[in-house]
A protein has these predicted regions:
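Short, solvent-exposed loop/beta-turn-alpha elements that line the ligand-binding surface or hinge
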Residues: 112-123, 127, 166-170, 201-204, ...
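Short helix-initiation/N-cap motifs at beta->coil->alpha
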Residues: 70-79, 172-176, 259-274
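Conserved N-terminal structural module of periplasmic/extracytoplasmic solute-binding proteins
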Residues: 4, 11-14, 19-100, 116-119, ...
Length: 458
């Protein structure tokens, strides 16, 4: 993590004492205290330099002081709690996940009537944490996940006499995906690959792909059936479909199922990046590890998570909007307005928009980011976004309980893959664990997500 330039010695000392890094201090003679003050508590250390640049640009342009403080890895919550208790508390801060929202909800200003909120896309509004009609957060980074594939391998396969498709465009459902994967695996020596799917790695570094991501696909369709966006209890209606895809990955990957728990995120990403497999379920963020290896940008594609669920053919990849901005309701009216003006500037000024989208790499869910020049230079992001342009419905990533639920699902999957446990343990971890962890969260956090009608999202 790169440290920003600090202009005040006392600020450095305070930062070191708290284990955080100050990314930027607006100030100097250009700042005008009569115009209010913006103090942003950031939790993304990888973009600290870009936030520093935005802060300096805005202060120079408006005379409003913008301070940015960045919590070091693992210390954000502790630093937030300390800073929010002070008289000069942050005027805006990051929220990542429902657990953080529940913890800091009492500090959050309702934003649904602000200009910035009104500039959110419909998907952005749907992911804003909302209670009783009040929307408290502004999602600022959209990402997508699905089944990434290598077009070169698929096209090579499609040219063979034994191919079951004419081109990658024929893969529009799970039945076809399964037939292609099994056929590629059968003819892998002729195709020069090690398998069809990348190893479903169940090392701790890789389990999120199967709990937090793939696990949300059956949840989406179950919630759709229930016409709700949240329930403390679920049935696992589509877990058999999840099992079908997981089994397909196990059966057509380069790794013996008994060994998948030893495969790390880096291991399985390398399988795809080096052109050893055709399919790799993951998100757009994987591009940073894929690029510069054996798979050209033009050879990257992305399918939705096909599992054989009725209606999935009309859906695109799943979207996730975990990173949001919130405004401190306890700030002075002057500072709140200065903060809202700063946020609006970030999402409307062309130079600021390029920093957010291209330099930070965010696909920002505001209507002002409608051109390619305001999207990240990431072919997977462009592909994922193209599904919506073609009329496909984005699968929404509904909130899962906590890390414990994810860990328990992963542990059951490991036993299943190794043959030491059966599928009923996975279902129990998914279904029974869901109720257990939401009850625990309600007791510890004091709230759970507020349910809305599924067909009235956004």
């Amino acid at each position: 993590m790169k440290q920003g330039i600090i202009t005040k010695t006392c600020a450095v000392a305070a930062a070191l004492a708290m284990g955080v890094s100050l990314a930027a201090c607006g100030g100097g003679s250009s700042a005008d205290s009569d115009k209010g003050h913006v103090y942003f508590m950031n939790n993304k250390s990888e973009v600290v330099d870009q936030y520093k640049q935005l802060a300096e640009m805005y202060t120079e342009k408006t005379g409003v002081q913008v301070d940015v403080q960045t919590g070091a890895s693992g210390t954000y919550d502790a630093t937030m709690s300390s800073e929010l208790a002070k008289s000069n508390a942050p005027t805006m801060f990051n929220i990542s996940g429902f657990d953080q929202f529940a913890k800091y909800q009492k500090y959050c200003e309702p934003l649904q009537d602000t200009e910035a909120y009104k500039l959110l896309t419909d998907d952005g509004k749907a992911y804003s944490y909302t209670i009783d009609g009040d929307s408290f957060t502004l999602p600022y980074a959209a990402e997508w996940y699905g089944i990434i594939y290598n077009k070169k391998i698929i096209n090579d396969y499609a040219s063979k006499d034994y191919a079951v498709i004419k081109s990658a465009d024929d893969i529009k459902d799970y039945k076809t995906l399964k037939a292609v994967a099994e056929s590629i695996n059968e003819h892998k020596d002729d195709l020069g690959v090690d398998g069809a799917f990348a190893t479903p790695g169940l090392d701790a570094s890789d389990t999120y792909r199967f709990s937090a991501h793939m696990g949300r696909i059956p949840l989406y369709y179950e919630y759709k059936d229930m016409n709700t966006t949240f329930s403390k209890t679920i049935k696992g209606t589509y877990l058999d479909n999840y099992k079908d895809l997981f089994d397909l990955e196990l059966e057509t990957s380069p790794t013996d199922p008994s060994l998948v728990s030893s495969k790390t995120y880096d291991d399985v990403t390398s399988e795809f990046a080096l052109g050893q497999v055709a399919f790799y379920p993951n998100g757009v963020w994987a591009y940073t590890q894929i690029k510069g290896n054996e798979v050209a940008d033009d050879d990257l594609g992305m399918l939705p998570y096909y599992m054989g669920i009725k209606g999935e053919e009309e859906s695109g990849p799943a979207g996730v909007y975990d990173a949001s901005w919130a405004v401190n309701k306890n700030a002075s009216d002057k500072d709140k307005q200065a903060t809202l003006d700063f946020i609006k500037w970030m999402v409307t000024d062309d130079e600021a928009k390029k920093i957010l989208s291209q330099d930070m790499g965010f696909s920002v869910p505001f209507t002002t980011f409608d051109g390619d020049e305001f999207q990240p230079d990431n072919p997977l992001t462009k592909i994922a976004r193209s599904y919506a342009a073609d009329g496909k419905i984005e699968v929404r990533s509904f909130t899962v309980p906590d890390q414990q639920w994810q860990d328990d699902v992963a542990a059951a999957l490991i036993e299943y893959a190794q043959g030491t446990g059966d599928w009923s343990k996975v279902k129990s971890a998914y279904v029974d664990g869901w109720a257990t962890e939401w009850n625990n969260n309600e007791e510890s956090l004091g709230s759970v997500p507020q349910a809305q009608k599924f067909d009235q999202q956004g």
